């Protein structure tokens, strides 16, 4: 009887303890496995806004221009009075360009590109029984170079200077007139022989750039450009220097 009681006490104490210990060990393993899975699960991170410093951007731009010229007699050849050309008026015209902008410093941007620059002038006369109009357009392929100072982040303001080497691509002069019989006639000249093959211009600009997202921006940039060398060759009666005020606007993509 004594042995039976001892055996019963042993089973009553030892077996539940062992069973409880197994449950605790099982729970610990389950917790560790859950923590291990949680550690290996990739966490979603918010995309960081791309830093501008040291970055490069590409852009496409259009420019609406109010174009005119400085026209003076060529004292080095055979100077001639301006005549009716003194009454020429500005011409509204469009230009286009693509390029890149590199942030060489937090506040300094270098810009280079390729542009189709156009300038010109117009003339209009209206008499009692006749009219005459003309329009001259000079088209240049240019590699504009700009250096700008920039401030701001989401909205940036910038200002700087520019230099334009320009190669003549096309010249077009369109003249149209009517006579007393109300007949209309016109003539188009594309002769470039009287023009220098290359000219140089300088400019000043200022503008604003606004970010649309992580990579895209838009910009607006007024610019004044003046031609440093004459459009005409040395054997011309006049010296011709373009004077252009333009408003450039376009899209920028940050690489």
Enumerate the predicted regions with their spans.
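Extracellular/periplasm-exposed beta-strand and loop segments of Gram-negative cell-envelope proteins
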Residues: 67-91, 118-138, 167-199, 227-242
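Outer-membrane beta-barrel proteins
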Residues: 42-49, 66, 104-106, 147-153, ...
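Bacterial Sec-dependent N-terminal signal peptides
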Residues: 1-27, 155, 248-255
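Repeated loop/turn-to-beta-strand initiation elements of outer-membrane beta-barrel proteins
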Residues: 107-110, 154-157, 214-218
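Predominantly the C-terminal beta-signal and adjacent terminal strand-loop region
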Residues: 192-195, 199-255
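Residues on the lipid-exposed face of transmembrane beta-strands in outer-membrane beta-barrel proteins
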Residues: 62, 96-104, 114-116, 143-149, ...
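Transmembrane beta-barrel architecture of outer-membrane proteins
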Residues: 91-95, 138-143, 156, 199-203, ...
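Short glycine/proline- and aromatic-enriched beta-strand/turn motifs that initiate or cap beta-hairpins
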Residues: 22-95, 99-101
């Amino acid at each position: 009887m004594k042995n039976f009681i001892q055996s019963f006490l042993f089973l009553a104490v030892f077996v539940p303890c062992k069973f409880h210990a197994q449950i605790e060990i099982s729970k610990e393993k389950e917790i560790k496995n859950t923590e291990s899975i949680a550690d290996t699960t990739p966490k979603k991170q918010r995309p960081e806004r791309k830093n501008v410093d040291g970055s490069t951007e590409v852009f496409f731009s259009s420019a609406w221009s109010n174009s005119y010229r400085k026209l003076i007699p060529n004292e080095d050849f055979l100077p001639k009075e301006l005549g009716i050309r003194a009454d020429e008026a500005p011409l509204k015209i469009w230009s286009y360009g693509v390029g890149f902008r590199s942030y060489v410093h937090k506040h300094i941007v270098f810009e280079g590109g390729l542009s189709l620059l156009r300038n010109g002038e117009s003339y209009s006369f209206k008499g009692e029984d006749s009219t005459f109009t003309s329009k001259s357009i000079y088209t240049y392929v240019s590699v504009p170079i700009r250096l700008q100072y920039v401030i701001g982040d989401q909205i940036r303001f910038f200002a700087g200077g520019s230099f334009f080497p320009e190669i003549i691509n096309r010249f077009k002069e369109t003249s149209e007139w009517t006579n007393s019989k109300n007949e209309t006639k016109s003539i188009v000249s594309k002769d470039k022989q009287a023009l220098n093959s290359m000219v140089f211009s300088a400019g000043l600009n200022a503008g604003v750039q606004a970010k649309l997202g992580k990579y895209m921006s838009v910009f607006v940039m007024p610019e004044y450009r003046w031609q440093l060398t004459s459009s005409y060759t040395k054997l011309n009666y006049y010296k011709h220097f373009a004077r252009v005020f333009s408003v450039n606007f376009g899209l920028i993509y940050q690489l």
